[in-house]
């Protein structure tokens, strides 16, 4: 029985690392609030779903609805009202952009932007764009 415990722990660690690798990992520790953590998790889910979609179909999804059932993207996630944030998605077969803009800017609610590069950009007091600083 004791010889099984290290093997089980190793298996759990391997599976956990595999899941993190597939999902892009947890939201960055730089989130300033739960709202930001949820929003960054949503962005990572969309970025991952777009990578999977492109690998499968040879182009990016042109709408959030097209991503449903790709990766872990659900039908409910296609709704652009994300609580404290509003989602703006612009998709073409060759590229896409995703913005999450807080309904009310605050020190713990910044705006985020990402595109097909997979890099997340941030702004403190205005909507983030492709020219905004990278999230660190």
Regions found by a protein language model. Name each.
Residues 8-18:
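Bacterial N-terminal signal peptides
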Residues 1-9:
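Bacterial N-terminal signal peptides that target proteins for export
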Residues 25-34, 41, 45-109, 114-117, ...:
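Extracellular/periplasmic head regions of type IV pilus-like filament subunits
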Residues 131-133:
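Short, Lys/Arg- and Gly-enriched loop/turn segments at beta-strand edges
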Residues 21-22:
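Boundary of Sec targeting at the N-terminus
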């Amino acid at each position: 029985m004791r010889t099984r415990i290290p093997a089980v722990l190793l298996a759990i660690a391997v599976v956990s690392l595999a899941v993190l690798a597939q999902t892009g990992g947890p939201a960055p520790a730089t989130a300033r609030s739960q709202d930001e953590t949820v929003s960054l998790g949503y962005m990572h889910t969309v970025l991952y779903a777009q990578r999977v979609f492109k690998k499968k179909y040879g182009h990016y999804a042109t709408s959030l609805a097209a991503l449903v059932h790709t990766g872990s993207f659900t039908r409910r996630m296609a709704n652009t009202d994300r609580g404290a944030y509003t989602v703006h998605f612009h998709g073409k077969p060759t590229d896409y952009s995703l913005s999450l803009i807080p309904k009310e800017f605050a020190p713990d609610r910044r705006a985020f932007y990402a595109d097909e590069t997979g890099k997340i950009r941030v702004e403190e007091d205005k909507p983030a764009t492709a020219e905004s600083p990278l999230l660190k």
